[in-house]
């Protein structure tokens, strides 16, 4: 069962073809170092193309901005993920600025390219295999990422005046 907010909210029953019946390995814990700025708030131009990072879609992330609800990072991805990943803390939005690859998840596979947005709810097991090095903007949100209520009916379907429709979304 995958659920964002427990058994009394929206959930998916997921059946594994090869059930993960035991823990194979617990990796090292690597703390994300978030440094609070001491300067007065002002406009900034963050030159993200000059950020030096490398690794997979998780290890190459460099946090840029954060608050109590989210962390915005930039990643220069030059390696495929060796193991599947599950974020139990946050929903993730990945914007593929450059590059090509494939997202593999327990819901299926999807080819990804420059200009794509990926919304990955917390609890989903996923990994990205890189075909062409990627530049990714990653947003981790501790609250669910969903369409605004004003664009949905009571059943969650997008309304006619929504800025996009289900037809413009790729489902896996």
List each model region and its residues.
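Conserved small/polar residues in nucleotide/adenosyl-binding loops
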Residues: 170-172
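An N-terminus-focused feature that recognizes amino-terminal "leader" regions
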Residues: 1-140
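Glycine- and charge-enriched low-complexity intrinsically disordered segments
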Residues: 145-168
